[in-house]
Swiss-Prot record:
Reaction proceeds by a ping-pong mechanism involving intermediate methylation of a conserved cysteine residue. Specifically methylates position 2 of adenine 2503 in 23S rRNA and position 2 of adenine 37 in tRNAs. m2A2503 modification seems to play a crucial role in the proofreading step occurring at the peptidyl transferase center and thus would serve to optimize ribosomal fidelity. It comes from Rhodopseudomonas palustris (strain BisA53). Its EC number is 2.1.1.192. It is found in: Cytoplasm. GO terms for molecular function: 4 iron, 4 sulfur cluster binding; metal ion binding; rRNA (adenine(2503)-C2-)-methyltransferase activity; rRNA binding; tRNA (adenine(37)-C2)-methyltransferase activity; tRNA binding. Disulfide bonds join 134-378. One of its GO terms (biological process) is tRNA methylation. The active site is at residues 121, 378. This is Dual-specificity RNA methyltransferase RlmN. [4Fe-4S] cluster binds at residues 141, 145, 148. Keywords: 4Fe-4S, Cytoplasm, Disulfide bond, Iron, Iron-sulfur, Metal-binding, Methyltransferase, rRNA processing, S-adenosyl-L-methionine, Transferase, tRNA processing.
Amino acid sequence: MTQASAAPLEKTALESYVALAKPSLIGLSRPELMERLGGIGVAAAQRKMRAQQLWHWIYVRGATDFAQMTSISKELRAQLAEHFTVDRPEVVTEQISNDGTRKWLLRLPSGQAGERAHEVECVYIPETDRGTLCVSSQVGCTLNCSFCHTGTQKLVRNLTAGEIVGQVMVAKDRLGDWPMAVASTQDAGENNRLITNVVMMGMGEPLYNFEAVRDALLIVSDNEGIGLSRRRITLSTSGVVPNIFRTGDEIGVMLAISLHAVRDELRNELVPLNKKYPLKELLQACRDYPGASNARRITFEYVMLKGVNDSLDDAKLLVKLLKGVPAKINLIPFNPWPGSAYQCSDWDQIEKFSEYIFNAGYSSPVRTPRGRDILAACGQLKSETEKLSARERDALRAMAMTD
């Protein structure tokens, strides 16, 4: 029996998505596209070719309407428009930070008349050598991590594969990142991309929505479509142990662990999921992760909380804990949000912590806070349906200016 089949699958109990009256083709696999084409009368002999044409128009050209798909007959385009859409999530607001970070509030189509539409946030972080898109996997979150703003919003539902891929497509739309003039991804070139990396670090726990996240990332990494290398896709989990091996085995992307503490007692408080999957089990799952090596290290994220987890004793325990794991440690200065109970560690303490880890042989970059002024930094995402009061917004601006 393999490790993938030995462990029970971990899923959220909440499954409240309702199918749309006119479903989107975004997020479907090629076999699923062929099945939908068969459902509207496309001959079996033509389905594979037509599905490939749709795949190209949706994921290479970024078509937003069937009318744009000129290599498909008018008759079939009319049939497609009658039964399906290629709609993305609706952009409700776009905020641009002083540092160039962009945050989009996206409204998802409601499943039925009268149902309240749900919203998620998606963030684009431009840097000199890359452009990283931070994507959400759930509306809200169930984990209740005490330092995370998203954790103050209850879990509403999982996103579909189409809604996850749709975030990438919205970002490419807004940034003008589609190679509209080329016929294949080989001609598009990696160097011309604005979105070079995707991180599953937005709202929600990706491994509590495993199947949809898997299906979405396989589409994003498909080399006949969006074509992002799996080495440029990182999935971050708080430690849903049964699905960690599956992530490497079935998706093959880079893994990041939201660690944040080196003792179970403290991690139980910061990341309550630790009560179910304690550090010993989590670290063993990391050692068993398929493909992990010095060339494909696992990233451990560690938020720096003043007087909580930032001592040199914590740094020593961290080095001991990661023995035998090909790892790098990302130190994250705590990003404040209204009502948070924590403060960011002093900068000199962060540097001492980083230096100790580096001298022990681990890469230990300190993440530069991005988008704090628009509540787009790590741990700050939350649907705008959970409205901030004017007082909270003023407090946020003050915190951003102070830091």
